[in-house]
């Protein structure tokens, strides 16, 4: 007989979500249908963890507490996700060593789940059902990647692609190593000394010879890191996220040529490269998906 599509009823379960980013902190309440019901940006305060707990407690009052599965927290890495602790992410010093999971769990009486922000985005991308075998590549002030293979997030892959080495005697990185991909291919590193203010300025002047040179250079740098991963874990698709998505086609064609000419599996199926959908509040929706993915699978 014909198959019957099934879906979870949106109001059946909820998740509290916390998106910790270098640009600020956002909290929200989401339902299992992927709907953002409430969202608040929190101003900088002396004790941000207490402020987050207070904001979440306020959100919790609007729904049946028994239907709230937990608190999802996304943050830049490196992290100790198992113990809910933020370790020592660069340019994130105020959060170093913070047991954010335990503090929020104790304050609200709900389980809390910490996840690398790029891995959380990959879980959200998986929930769209577009692909179950992909890499999500985030490029902005840093670089991160997460891999979903056979529908499963590779949990032993921490997302720190930006701190893989592409030149053993290269530039000194904030992590203490030399030659990290991030020191060459993050947007600030790429544009340093170029005269372009940001990525948007660069792509809006894509006709400029210097802009074309930088786009070519970015593709070369990124391919050096990506090919190492693709040779180990081939994927069908790469999804781009971050500011790099603006005028993504300028980079995608260059990147496709670089990867296609060097990857071990060239000539098999070409790896497709797409931007992630332009989803408002993706960070907070991704943090909520960290919770839902613990209870429901694709």
Where are these regions (language model features)?
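Short, active-site-adjacent cap segments at secondary-structure transitions
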Residues: 78-81, 119-122, 144-145, 154, ...
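ATP-binding/phosphotransfer module of carbohydrate and carboxylate kinases, centering on a glycine-rich
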Residues: 1-67, 128-129, 172, 177, ...
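Glycine/GP-enriched mid-protein hinge/lid loop-to-helix segment characteristic of carbohydrate kinases
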Residues: 39-41, 48, 95-96, 102-209
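Short, acidic, Ser/Thr-enriched surface-loop or helix-capping motifs
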Residues: 31, 81, 148
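Short glycine-aspartate micro-motif
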Residues: 15-19, 68-72, 134-138, 146
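Glycine-rich phosphate-binding loop and adjoining helix at the ATP-binding site
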Residues: 36-133, 250-261
């Amino acid at each position: 007989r014909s198959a019957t599509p099934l879906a979870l009823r949106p109001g059946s379960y909820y998740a509290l979500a916390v998106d910790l980013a270098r640009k600020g902190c956002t909290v929200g309440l989401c339902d299992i249908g992927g709907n953002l019901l409430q969202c608040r940006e929190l101003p900088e305060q002396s004790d941000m963890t207490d402020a987050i707990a207070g904001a979440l407690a306020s959100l919790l009052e609007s729904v049946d507490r028994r239907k709230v599965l937990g608190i999802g927290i996304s943050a830049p890495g490196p992290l100790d996700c198992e113990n809910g602790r933020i370790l020592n992410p660069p340019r994130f010093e105020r959060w170093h060593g913070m047991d954010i999971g335990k503090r929020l769990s104790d304050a609200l009486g709900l389980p809390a789940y910490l996840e690398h922000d790029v891995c959380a985005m990959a879980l959200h991308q998986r929930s769209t059902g577009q692909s179950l075998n992909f890499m999500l590549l985030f490029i902005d002030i840093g670089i991160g990647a997460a891999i979903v293979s056979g529908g499963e997030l590779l949990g032993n892959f921490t997302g720190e692609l930006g701190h893989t080495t592409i030149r053993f005697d290269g530039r000194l990185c904030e992590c203490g190593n030399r030659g990290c991909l991030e020191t060459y291919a993050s947007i600030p590193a790429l544009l340093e000394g170029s005269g372009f203010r940001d990525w948007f300025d660069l792509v809006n002047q894509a006709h400029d010879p210097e802009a074309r040179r930088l786009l070519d250079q970015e593709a070369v740098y990124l391919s050096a890191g990506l090919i190492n991963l693709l040779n180990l874990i081939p994927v069908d698709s790469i999804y781009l996220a971050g500011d790099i998505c603006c005028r993504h086609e300028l980079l995608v064609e260059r990147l496709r040529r670089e990867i296609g000419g060097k990857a071990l599996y060239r000539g098999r199926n070409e790896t497709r490269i797409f931007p992630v959908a332009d989803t408002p509040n993706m960070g907070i929706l991704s943090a909520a998906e960290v919770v839902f993915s613990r209870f429901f699978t694709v």
